[in-house]
Swiss-Prot record:
Function: Component of the cytochrome c oxidase, the last enzyme in the mitochondrial electron transport chain which drives oxidative phosphorylation. The respiratory chain contains 3 multisubunit complexes succinate dehydrogenase (complex II, CII), ubiquinol-cytochrome c oxidoreductase (cytochrome b-c1 complex, complex III, CIII) and cytochrome c oxidase (complex IV, CIV), that cooperate to transfer electrons derived from NADH and succinate to molecular oxygen, creating an electrochemical gradient over the inner membrane that drives transmembrane transport and the ATP synthase.
Compartmental location: Mitochondrion inner membrane
Bound cofactor: record note: Binds a dinuclear copper A center per subunit.
UniProt name for this protein: Cytochrome c oxidase subunit 2
Mitochondrial intermembrane topology ranges: 1-14, 88-227
Organism (species): Macaca mulatta (Rhesus macaque)
InterPro entries: CcO_II, CcO_II-like_C, CcO_II_C, Copper_CuA, Cupredoxin, Cyt_c_oxidase_su2, Cyt_c_oxidase_su2_TM_dom, Cyt_c_oxidase_su2_TM_sf
Positions with a binding annotation for Mg(2+): 198
Annotated Cu cation A2 binding sites: 196, 198, 200, 204
Topological domains annotated Mitochondrial matrix: 46-59
Length: 227
């Protein structure tokens, strides 16, 4: 999870998040190069005596500043489109879990395990144990398997919410009357934190998400054993 004064992204826990980090570095290098070139042009203009201030036609310059930005945009767009395809791809998920947003808590339903349903509320500060994270702990974590494709069906019962876990590269809107889906494959066990990422009312900041990722063999014994 993130920590104070962290400048980089969180460590990836899914292939999609690894792709997002790579794309972030790719785009950052492109923006850094553009910023350097613009700064160099500005400094050159300020420090160089202009010898011709009445240029009315510069065909080569116009060609360069038209083609070069187009090439840069293409180089940024291609990996972005690939990631968009990966995030929307659904390849025969092994498990389906439904997440329903409320003001201001989440409800989870394990449709593959007899319709197991439970609510997940933020723990008040008085109920926290030593080492627990303030405003991020919940009474019931959503338990998910690793190394298996999981489909999350996400919706809302009242207003707009957004189910988000950064380390998994997940952010899917929960829209009333609409069922959105996202598929992911976690790569390592652990406890990972997220929050509702859509302003949903007075207690929007008190709507955390905690996912506990466990080995597939343990999960197949039944998620109720880990709740």
């Amino acid at each position: 999870m993130a920590h104070p004064v962290q400048l980089s992204l969180q460590d990836a826990t899914s292939p999609v998040m690894e792709e997002l980090i790579t794309f972030h570095d790719h785009a950052f290098m492109a923006m850094s190069l553009i910023s350097f070139l613009v700064l160099y042009a500005l400094l050159s203009t300020l420090t160089t005596k202009l010898t011709n201030t009445s240029i009315t036609d510069a065909q080569e310059m116009e060609t360069i500043w038209t083609i070069l930005p187009a090439i840069i945009l293409i180089l940024i767009a291609l990996p972005s489109l690939r990631i968009l395809y990966l995030t929307d791809e659904v390849n025969d998920p092994s498990f389906t879990i439904k997440s329903i947003g409320h003001q201001w808590y989440w409800t989870y339903e394990y449709t593959d395990y007899g319709g197991l349903i439970f609510n997940s509320y933020m723990l008040p500060p008085l109920f926290l144990n030593p080492g627990d994270l303030r405003l991020l702990e919940v009474d019931n974590r959503v338990v998910l398997p690793i190394e298996a494709p999981v489909r999350m069906m996400i919706t809302s019962q009242d207003v707009l919410h957004s189910w988000t876990i950064p380390t998994l590269g997940l952010k899917t809107d929960a829209v009333p009357g609409r069922l959105n889906q996202t598929v992911f494959t976690a790569t390592r066990p652990g406890v990972y934190y997220g929050q509702c990422s859509e302003i949903c009312g007075a207690n929007h900041s008190f709507m955390p998400i905690v996912a506990e990722l466990i080995p597939l063999k343990i999960f197949e014994m039944g998620p109720v054993l880990t709740l």
